[in-house]
Amino acid sequence: MNEAILSRNHVKVKGSGKASIMFAPGFGCDQSVWNAVAPAFEEDHRVILFDYVGSGHSDLRAYDLNRYQTLDGYAQDVLDVCEALDLKETVFVGHSVGALIGMLASIRRPELFSHLVMVGPSPCYLNDPPEYYGGFEEEQLLGLLEMMEKNYIGWATVFAATVLNQPDRPEIKEELESRFCSTDPVIARQFAKAAFFSDHREDLSKVTVPSLILQCADDIIAPATVGKYMHQHLPYSSLKQMEARGHCPHMSHPDETIQLIGDYLKAHV
């Protein structure tokens, strides 16, 4: 067991089951974002939680701009953790960009993963008409990066509300906002650039691991057209429409998230 890797990514292992399930956070979040979901799987699974380098309680000294200027560096971190824990045929549950990171890892080392559960994923956030609508124009994303640089706290407030799309749930907005604010602003901006300007549409056809796509209602970050596109181009995928609104069902609707993941695992694992 490589303790250096486990320390770098602040890896936590819980549960007592034989099967392994790994939970990956989305942009700007750490492993605690899964607090309302992950414990439900501890009875039957070995649950693995981790932080991206630069987030949560990871080792900031390990951050390397060249390594993490694309999602490939984060995907390698996932593979490093799998190897450090000697994981095989692991269920990978990723939120948002975390889902794409897991997907890229599975392309490199498919034998390490049995299934992918992708919560609100998007292979490309930029519109590319007429074939593809990711939800954003380039100037919108450039504006997001500019706001992060000029007023990070203000950006965190606005972006948390936009992502959640839960105006009647201020406590959840404050929780997500605090997670954004706890991340190093420079690293967060670089991660945002790597995530929101990436285009992994051509990688979808390379995936051989079966997957479940969980599509939220009224998701501004990953709209329904994106979920359908992924399902059409991702081999061995299933698409499930959630009742949950917004982009963070594991925070706003944990019970539904647990139910849908559990149902998929019972039927396919």
Swiss-Prot record:
Induction: Induced by entry into stationary phase, but not by carbon and energy starvation. One of its GO terms (biological process) is biotin biosynthetic process. The active site is at 96, 219, 247. Gene3D superfamilies: alpha/beta hydrolase. Changing residue 247 to A: Loss of energy stress signaling. Changing residue 96 to A: Loss of energy stress signaling. One of its GO terms (molecular function) is pimelyl-[acyl-carrier protein] methyl ester esterase activity. Belongs to the AB hydrolase superfamily. Positive regulator required for energy stress activation of the sigma-B transcription factor. Could be required for RsbP phosphatase activity. This is Sigma factor SigB regulation protein RsbQ. It comes from Bacillus subtilis (strain 168). The gene is rsbQ.
